[in-house]
Structure formats: C-alpha cells, structure tokens
Curated annotation (Swiss-Prot):
It comes from Methylocella silvestris (strain DSM 15510 / CIP 108128 / LMG 27833 / NCIMB 13906 / BL2). GO terms for cellular component: cytoplasm. The keyword Magnesium applies. This is Nucleoside diphosphate kinase. It is found in: Cytoplasm. Major role in the synthesis of nucleoside triphosphates other than ATP. The ATP gamma phosphate is transferred to the NDP beta phosphate via a ping-pong mechanism, using a phosphorylated active-site intermediate. Homotetramer. GO terms for molecular function: ATP binding; metal ion binding; nucleoside diphosphate kinase activity. Its EC number is 2.7.4.6. One of its GO terms (biological process) is CTP biosynthetic process. The gene is ndk. It catalyses: a 2'-deoxyribonucleoside 5'-diphosphate + ATP = a 2'-deoxyribonucleoside 5'-triphosphate + ADP; a ribonucleoside 5'-diphosphate + ATP = a ribonucleoside 5'-triphosphate + ADP. Its main location: cytoplasm.
Amino acid sequence: MAIERTFSIIKPDATRRNLTGAINALIEKAGLRIIAQKRVQITRPQAETFYAVHKERPFFGALVDTMISGPVVVQVLEGENAIKAYRDVLGATDPAKAAPGTIRKEFALSVGENSGHGSDASETAAIEIAQWFSGNEIVG
C-alpha cells in the first residue's frame, strides 16, 4: 500500500461548534496522521479560487458564502491510501446518506454545511496542499 498525503478542511459549521478535536480524533482513529494544521479565515477570493471547479453550478454562491462564514481548519493528512481513507471517514456529501461513525453523519448540519472537505485525487490533493501550506509548514 502507498503512503499518501491528502488535504482536509474542517468547515465553519464544525469550527463554530468547537468540533475540531472530535473530528481530529476520527481522523486519527482512521489511521491518518495530521502532519500540518492551521486555523484560517478564508477570504471570498480564496474560496472562489478553491471551488472554481463548481463556478457554473447553482450552489456555487452558497458554497462560497458558507466557506467564508467563519474560520476553517486546513490540514495535511498522511497515511496508507490517505485520499480514500479520509474520504471514507468523511462520509457521503449528504449527511443523511453518510455511514454511521463518519464525520458528516456525526457532525454535519446539512448538505451545504457538511463539516468537511477532502481531496478527491492525488493531483487535486497536491494542488490544494500547495494552495494553503508552504513546505516548511508540513512536518511529517
């Protein structure tokens, strides 16, 4: 199995409710190491750039508004098959369809306020990590 890195965001709906520690516990229980983490306030231009792939989708404006509504925690996670492992612990985008014990099933408020983001592929992870972290901030 391959040791990979992936990118995670703990979204404003979760940070607002002080769930960072509980979410980190689920991440670590899944066998992933948190090798970089910081709390930031995303600006509108940052959110629009980060979610540019969704620009033409009807939910784009609401997504950007949600992401700038409060602080987020951005993270780099590392472990065996980290991208899949994190997406598994994150759960389905719709919390009603997420498996019990996943971040979204346990903590999400709705599809729009679903507590987390995770990279969907190694290429995406590399781009997302580089957008939020410099090399010396990642200590693995």
